[in-house]
Each structure stands twice: as C-alpha cells, then as structure tokens.
C-alpha cells in the first residue's frame, strides 16, 4: 500500500483567445468607400426632398424648385444635418469590424501646437497663392455661394448653415478622406501616393465648383494630407478644414451684402 500523499494533477490552462487586429487593405477600403458614398448621396437627397416638402407645407406661398435645391442654403444645411450622422455611423461600423480602436484607426488625437502653427501658415500660403492666381486669370467666386447664404438667411436657418458647413461637413469629410481612406491606403500605397489620391477624391466630390476652384480644393487636400501624415492627427486637419470653411462663410456673407 502506497502511503505517499497523492499530488493532484493540474491541467494547464488553455490560452486565452487572441483577437486578430484586422486592418482593411487598400482595395477593401475602396470597396467600403463605395457604399459609404452611396449612403451620403442617398441621405443628402432624402434630406433635401424632405425639407422641400415640409417647407412648402408650412409656407405654400414659397415654392422651392427642384432646380434650386443645389444652391438653397436651408436645403443644403438640412441635407448635411441628415447625411453626416448616417455616414459617420457607417464608417464607425467599418472601423469596429477592423477590431482596431476607433481613435487609433482614425488618428483622433490632439495635435502639437507647432503642427497647428505650420498648418495655418501652409493654408494661408495656399489660399493667398490661389487667390492671386484667380485675380490674374479673371476667375470669379461662383455666384451660387452668395445665393446659398441668402436663402439660408431668409429662411431663418443661417445658424444651421454655419454649423453644417463649418462643423458637420468638414468632420464628415475628414473622417472619410484623411481618416478611413488614408489609413487604408497608406500602408500599401505609401504616404505620398495616398496624399495625392485622397486629395483628388476629395476634390472630385465638389463637382458644383468650376475647375479652377476644384484645383484649389485639390491643393488644400495635398496640404491637409501632408499634415495628417506629419502630425498623425485627424483633429488637426478637421480644425484647419473648419477654418477654411469659416472663411468661405465670411466670403459668402460679404458677397451677399453687395
């Protein structure tokens, strides 16, 4: 009879499952971008039509034609208010499926002050340069910008227009172009090709402008893309984008006052 105390056998613990930190590659990112843009256009269209219907129900004497929707500031402001949450929700879902924290994936971190200063200086240089070139070539600011401001003011929706154009619109676009697309493209395509591609795509969606001003948007996109790569901060590019749009609102107000 064995009197030695029995020693219980301890089974080794199974290793905890490791979550795969998936990152969407360039083509998967581009594939996601298509339905996201569809959502943007769809919700902007639905928002514009819904606002037109509601407005004409409340003000039957004020007719908003289909042709004027693209330059009606109240309609545009409401359409951005409707579309931005939908677009941001879809992008949030895409990032969640990547299993990478949202802040890391989209570079949602505060920038350094020196990057802020450099960004302001570069944007000022681009805007001054394109402004001088516009004067030399006889380019005039599109008239629909003043129409957009006036129609929003007459509808009593100027605060909503400012919020949509200075906050919601820039944040939506930065999350899309310098956030989702930049993160998906840069590791495979390289930083500079990604800067150029995202700037070009960003300019293309502004089809309401003439070619000259689309070129200006492309140049701004190059600066914002470079700053995104240098600083690693999407909040920096959002703030600068909002600053540019604020200046555009001031310009629209000056045009409308003439």
Segments (PLM) and residue ranges:
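Active-site-flanking alpha-helical
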Residues: 176-185, 239, 248
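Hydrophobic core segments of transmembrane alpha-helices in multi-pass, intramembrane catalytic enzymes
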Residues: 83-87, 161-164, 216-220, 224
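Structural signal for membrane-spanning alpha-helices in multi-pass inner-membrane proteins
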Residues: 90-95, 130, 134, 165, ...
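Hydrophobic alpha-helical transmembrane segments
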Residues: 30-34, 77, 113-121, 159-163, ...
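Juxtamembrane helix-loop-helix connectors linking adjacent transmembrane helices
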Residues: 53-77, 99-169, 187, 253-258
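N-terminal, membrane-interfacial amphipathic/helix-forming hydrophobic leader that caps
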Residues: 1-105, 113, 249-258
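Short juxtamembrane and helix-loop transition motifs at transmembrane-helix boundaries
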Residues: 83, 156-157, 172-181, 198-206
């Amino acid at each position: 009879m064995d009197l030695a105390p029995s020693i219980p056998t301890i089974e080794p613990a199974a290793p905890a499952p490791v979550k795969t930190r998936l990152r969407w590659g360039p083509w998967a990112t581009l594939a996601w971008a298509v339905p996201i843009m569809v959502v943007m256009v769809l919700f902007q269209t639905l928002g514009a039509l819904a606002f037109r219907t509601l407005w004409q129900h409340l003000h039957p004497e004020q007719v908003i034609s289909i042709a004027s929707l693209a330059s009606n500031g109240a309609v545009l402001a409401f359409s951005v208010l409707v579309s931005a949450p939908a677009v941001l929700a879809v992008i949030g879902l895409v990032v969640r499926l990547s299993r990478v924290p949202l802040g890391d994936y989209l570079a949602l971190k505060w920038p350094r002050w020196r990057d802020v200063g450099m960004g302001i200086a570069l944007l000022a240089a681009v805007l001054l340069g394109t402004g001088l070139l516009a004067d030399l070539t006889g380019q005039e600011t599109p008239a629909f910008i003043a129409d957009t401001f006036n129609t929003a003011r007459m509808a009593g929706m100027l605060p909503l227009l400012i919020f949509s154009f200075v906050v919601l619109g820039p944040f939506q676009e930065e999350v899309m172009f310098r956030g989702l697309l930049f993160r998906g493209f840069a590791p495979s395509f390289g930083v500079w090709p990604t800067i150029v591609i995202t700037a070009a795509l960003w300019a293309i969606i502004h089809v309401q402008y003439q070619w000259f001003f689309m070129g200006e948007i492309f140049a701004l996109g190059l600066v914002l893309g470079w700053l995104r790569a240098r600083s690693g901060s999407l909040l920096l590019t959002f703030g600068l984008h909002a600053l540019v749009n604020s200046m555009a609102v001031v310009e629209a107000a000056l045009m409308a006052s003439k």
